[in-house]
Amino acid sequence: LLCLQWSYQEHWRIMVARPFNHIGPRQREDFVIPGVARQLVRIRKGLQAARIDIGDVDVTRDFLDVRDVINAYFSLLESGQNGEIYNVCSGQEQRIRSLIEQMAAIAGLNVDLHQDQTRLRPSEQRRVMGNSLKLKEQTGWKPGISITETLQSVLSDWEARVERE
């Protein structure tokens, strides 16, 4: 918020982008979706038992493909209004369990989910979802990549990465 104060005092053009959960190719495996994708690829290649080690699968998040995030940032640079705060999100609440099931179906696998106690966070937010209406209305931006396309891209990325392990 300090930057907004400076924008008013110094007449700088500043906007605040509030990013929610981004996912996409090349993301590190310590994030939930790429971590699961890596495990699914390893299962399909016979490098791991058909069990996904995971934290809490019943929380929800607002995931947005990183390519849509980049487009949102460009839209803000071109059309965003000075001093405004924008949520960069899909506006769709996704349960982690559902995304894992979708990825397993894409991969053609049946897997067991194993809750790994070391991956649980005691102060985990149960639900996270944003509203990107202001961003859409003021810049004309809208997400262009479906969650299914994103999950397919993440799985394809991990296919190549596991080959190099």
Model-derived regions: residue spans:
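C-terminal substrate-binding subdomain of Rossmann-fold SDR/epimerase-dehydratase oxidoreductases
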Residues: 32-165
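Short, conserved clusters of charged catalytic residues that mark active-site
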Residues: 1, 18, 130
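Active-site Tyr-X1-5-Lys
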Residues: 1-15, 37-44
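Active-site "gating" loop of Rossmann-like NAD(P)-dependent oxidoreductase/epimerase domains
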Residues: 7-9, 27, 48-51
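Flexible, glycine-rich beta-alpha linker
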Residues: 15-35, 60
